[in-house]
Amino acid sequence: MNDNHNNVNSIHQFKTQGIDGTEINFKNYEGRKILVVNVASECGLTPQYAQLQELYESFQDKLVIVGFPANNFGGQEPGTNGEIQTFCTKNYGVTFPLAAKIDIETHPIYRWLTSKKENGSIDSSVEWNFNKYLLNESGQLVKYLPSSASPIDETIVDWVNS
């Protein structure tokens, strides 16, 4: 992980551990839009996994989705990395990258995403599972959407196509 997150103007400067133990290097996603979403397996919004997968399959050439499992809200992601990965694959056919389980409040990427001082664009707070952060092809944060926003909402689809 990149703990030197001050004055980082692009998510492309970050790396994190994948749910399978491999590294997710955001630099590999240069030239594609990125949707970052905090996810949970026991939330009323968990069916959004299916919509995220649909979005990913429809736009893989220009969009990457990275899910960050976290147990910060209502204890709704109690599983281990292995249990989460199995759940997502078995129930939703998830093929987009999933990070290893994190703590939203302390993870460097989420500190960067939520602080305008650090990302240069938007102040936000992660208030529940399935909050969405949209980043452009240069890795700059351009939009934040709350949990209630469907991954296949026209706001997101139009943004991907723009």
Annotate each language-model stretch with its function.
Residues 31-33, 42, 46-71, 89-92:
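Conserved helix-turn-beta segment immediately C-terminal to the redox Cys motif
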Residues 18, 38-42:
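Amphipathic alpha-helical repeat scaffolds
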Residues 38, 62-79, 94-106:
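Thiol-based oxidoreductase modules, predominantly thioredoxin-like and allied folds used
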Residues 82-129:
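Short, internal strand/loop/helix patches
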Residues 111, 115-162:
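Thiol-/selenol-based redox modules, centered on thioredoxin-like
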Residues 1-27, 47:
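N-terminal "domain-start" segment that seeds a small globular fold
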